[in-house]
Amino acid sequence: MASTLDSASLNLKVGFEIHQQLATKNKLFCNCRCKEAKEYDSSFVRKLRPTQSELGAYDPAAMFEFSKMRTVEYQAAFGSSCLVEADEEPPHDVTKEALETALIFSLALHSKVMHEIHVMRKIVIDGSNTSGFQRTMLVASGGHLDVAGKRIGVQSICLEEDAAKLISDEKGVRKFGLDRLGVPLVEIALEPVT
């Protein structure tokens, strides 16, 4: 029995997040090149664990990932990863080219650029980030995008680091390539539309 859903009768609104990798020379928090590795030179193993928030609570999604008790193996290639990606060295200053590109996106979308841009951390312990969190910055808010005669509002524009590349996920071991980890990307959150 086939049925159709009518978005108007459901009062359905849908918002989109657009993620775009930036074609910068270097990664977001180090001087490594943004290039895909053909082969990997070294590897290391980690088990990521959740930590309490400032309020003393554990993130439910982090607890769910932790319950899987997976081992994570990271593959690294010289030139496209360093101690920053391995979480063995503090991140460097934000790459100027990536920040300037995010500001250009913001101005093109008529968004209000923040007076100060701070690096925040989002908990991620599925193995796709060696540190257990993703670094992200709110660059601008508001604005709009005109598409096919319709104006779509922009909620926020963030500059963040991309996740490591999943190579395999077998028998309780996830393997990731660090060549993609830290590549800058812009995240544009659009307002819901009917």
Language model features with spans:
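Basic, nucleic-acid-interacting segments
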Residues: 2-194
